């Protein structure tokens, strides 16, 4: 086994396992421990559950350390099989459901796939999210300037500062129609807001990045090029930040933030509603 791995961590569900992963990762991030993550979705029958149990037990036998198991399983028979394993098992949903049951004075009605599955109750939200993703893809990197008025936010920035991944995350996670527009090297001699963006200034949000980080990212894409040179990166970042200040466009330095953090900060600063899917 890998000596750098302190614990093996399983995320198990009879659905997508997204909930188990998200909550499990949040918990594990509180501890200074190296982990080997194993995600097992759609554990929906006894034969698969027994195979998962065997996998957990095998790791225990090999390492002598109990694997950590975060699970979200509503089928009692499946859950019982996992609980018989040699893992340290934590029902991440039940830990919250039990106290709420007393507060609400209601019994839960657990259904597999309810959180991330497609069902009549969430079809409208699902369709809205797909529409947001389609819109965002069609308006990535300035591909199209049509229907920009339908965007909820328009991200600006130099090439490789994080516009595309942030736009896609906003669309996929929150159902936000996010367009993005790049400022390229040819724009820098006379950098101004494009005419199509001026009437939509209330939707504009700028991204910037430290020149050193930008140069490193670009170097991976175009090695030893003017595009990746420190001089070029410093100049572009300086010009774009000056444009943001001149036009009073809210902006964020993305250097030390994850895509998730950037997107959340944009939602907060722009006053956009968070719609979780």
Curated annotation (Swiss-Prot):
| HAMAP family, A to Z | PSRP
Family, similarity comment = Belongs to the pyruvate, phosphate/water dikinase regulatory protein family. PSRP subfamily.
> Catalytic activity annotated for this protein?
[pyruvate, water dikinase] + ADP = [pyruvate, water dikinase]-phosphate + AMP + H(+); [pyruvate, water dikinase]-phosphate + phosphate + H(+) = [pyruvate, water dikinase] + diphosphate
> Which EC number(s) are documented for this chain?
2.7.11.33, 2.7.4.28
Q: Which InterPro entries match?
A: Kinase-pyrophosphorylase (IPR005177), PSRP (IPR026530)
What are the record keywords, sorted? Kinase, Nucleotide-binding, Serine/threonine-protein kinase, Transferase
Report the protein name in the record. Answer: Putative phosphoenolpyruvate synthase regulatory protein
Binding positions (ADP): 157-164
Q: What is the recorded function of this protein according to its Swiss-Prot or TrEMBL entry? A: Bifunctional serine/threonine kinase and phosphorylase involved in the regulation of the phosphoenolpyruvate synthase (PEPS) by catalyzing its phosphorylation/dephosphorylation.
Q: Which organism is it from?
A: Enterobacter sp. (strain 638)
List the GO molecular function terms.
ADP binding; ATP binding; phosphotransferase activity, phosphate group as acceptor; protein serine/threonine kinase activity
Q: Determine the domain of life of the protein's source.
A: Bacteria
């Amino acid at each position: 086994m890998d000596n750098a791995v302190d614990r093996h961590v399983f995320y198990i569900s009879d659905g997508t396992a997204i909930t188990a992963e998200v909550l499990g990762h949040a918990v594990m991030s509180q501890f200074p421990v190296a982990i080997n993550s194993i995600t097992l979705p759609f554990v929906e029958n006894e034969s698969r559950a027994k195979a998962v149990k065997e996998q957990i037990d095998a790791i225990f036998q090999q390492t002598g350390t109990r694997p950590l198991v975060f699970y979200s399983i509503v089928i009692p028979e499946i859950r019982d099989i996992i609980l018989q394993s040699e893992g340290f098992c934590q029902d991440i949903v039940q830990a919250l459901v039990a106290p709420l049951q007393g507060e609400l004075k209601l019994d839960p009605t657990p259904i597999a796939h309810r959180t991330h599955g497609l069902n009549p109750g969430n079809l409208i939200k699902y369709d809205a999210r797909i529409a947001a993703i389609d819109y965002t893809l069609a308006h990535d990197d300035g591909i199209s300037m049509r229907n920009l008025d339908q965007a909820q936010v328009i991200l600006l920035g130099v090439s490789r500062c994080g516009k595309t991944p942030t736009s896609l995350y906003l669309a996929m996670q929150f159902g936000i129609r996010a367009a993005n527009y790049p400022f390229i090297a040819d724009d820098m001699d006379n950098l101004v807001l494009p005419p199509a963006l001026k009437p939509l200034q209330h939707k504009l949000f700028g991204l910037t990045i430290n020149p050193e980080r930008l140069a490193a990212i670009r170097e991976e894409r175009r090695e030893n090029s003017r595009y990746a040179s420190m001089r070029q990166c410093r100049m572009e970042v300086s010009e774009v930040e000056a444009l943001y200040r001149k036009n009073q466009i809210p902006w964020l330095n993305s250097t030390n933030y994850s895509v998730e953090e950037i997107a959340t900060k944009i939602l907060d600063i722009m006053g956009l509603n968070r719609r979780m899917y």
